[in-house]
Amino acid sequence: MNQTTFPEQSRKMTDVEAEAYFNKMLTQIKEFNPNEIVAVARSGFSYAMWAAQELKLPLGAYWAERAELVIGSDPERIVFIDDNILSGTTYKATKMFMTRYYPNCEWRWAVLFSDWHTPEDVRNEIIQGVRLPYFAMEPMWGSRKISIDYGVRYRDE
């Protein structure tokens, strides 16, 4: 999507904002009490790894375009994590996928942020750090790579 199609130009989310949104999202995930975190390929991997490490939970992976879910042994409660949600297309496809293949698994969808394009019915069903009135380019948080110590990356890793 071209940036000019948005009501206002995108702006880069600051590290402080991203940290606050991530923590809000993580608090809601904790309240759901999952037994596994699932990274939505590709953009959800960083956030999902951080959440899994913080919560000391196993990490699975999901490729929506090919309907492939890699998880541990039949978890009861999982949270899919992606970076953002716009129209909700991937989320809606995942709802159908989970109903068909994992009908006994309770699950939630979590994102760092949604924006004004995200339909209200989708926003009401998901975990989100924040709803933004613009399209944000989230920071890379380059120094926050998964490591022995949260937020620290050692040269030999």
PLM segments and residue spans:
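PRPP-dependent phosphoribosyltransferase catalytic core
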Residues: 2-8, 96-157
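Short glycine-rich phosphate-binding loop at a beta-alpha junction
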Residues: 32-43
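Short beta-strand/turn micro-motifs composed of small residues
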Residues: 39-41, 82-85, 111-114
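Conserved P-loop NTPase mechanochemical-coupling segment
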Residues: 6-7, 41, 51-55
